[in-house]
Amino acid sequence: VPLPPAQDRPARLGRRLALALVVAIAVGVVAVFTGAIEVPERHDPWAPLDVRAAPNWLTTYKLARARGDPVHCQAALADTGMRYERVPDRVTGPGCGFENAVRLRSAGVRLGSAPTLSCPMALSFFMWEHHALQPAALRHFGQPVAAIDHLGSYACRNVNRGEGAIPGAPRSRHATADAFDVAGFVLADGRRVNVRRDWHPDASNPSAALLNDAHLGACRFFRGVLGPEYNAAHRDHFHLETGGFPMCR
């Protein structure tokens, strides 16, 4: 049998290696899916979100999957240990209302008035508070955040770009309880960190550093985050939301 031309041999070898790799991957996927190979839950893309496990490369995917399924979202929310009550689904106006929402009574931090949040929003809030905010407070102040000052969640209104709610504009994520506005934090010793007063993009002091880390950390767990650098309407708070286009400003 004549040998193939020398210039064809690397191509043939490459095709064989590619085929072998595809077969190996397929066998591995089947083995994992059928349980022949046991994969730790934190590295298993089919395992449900573990809300208390340290975030890894699969956390964003698992969080998005939980947010997208009402049953999975409620199951994950139940594992957080937060105190809340279910809010009946209802329409409160054109483009406004609640679906799969909760009234958050306690979240490991004091919240003042209990915000009404969609399940995806409440789940993202826990992930941010537990895995981003509290570690940042311990890093910069050596103590946890005891309370969060907020400006509310649900409001049946349009998008606000700085001059108030705009007639004819799309509905805000607040209109479906998919947004939460955070104005500042109270530390365990009573000190306050305030977005309007303490925000500095250069993070030149502990308060500014905490706010910068809280803002950046929020971008890992929420779909959209807007802060003082976005526009004047957000100079005094962080706007956190789920749904819509991804943004971190």
Sequence positions of predicted segments:
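Active-site-adjacent substructure of cysteine-protease-like catalytic cores
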Residues: 137-177
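Electrostatic, structured charged patches in enzyme active sites and in nucleic-acid/phosphate-binding
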Residues: 39-49, 148, 205-211, 220-223
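Active-site acidic/histidine clusters and adjacent loop/turn architecture
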Residues: 62-149
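Short, solvent-exposed polar/charged micro-motifs at secondary-structure junctions
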Residues: 94-100, 156-162, 238-239
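Catalytic cores and adjacent binding grooves of peptidoglycan-active enzymes
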Residues: 10, 15-23, 168-249
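Long non-globular sequence segments
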Residues: 1-86
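Short, compositionally biased low-complexity segments
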Residues: 39-54, 97-110, 190-191
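Second-shell loop/turn segments in exported
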Residues: 58-64, 115-126, 168-169, 195-205
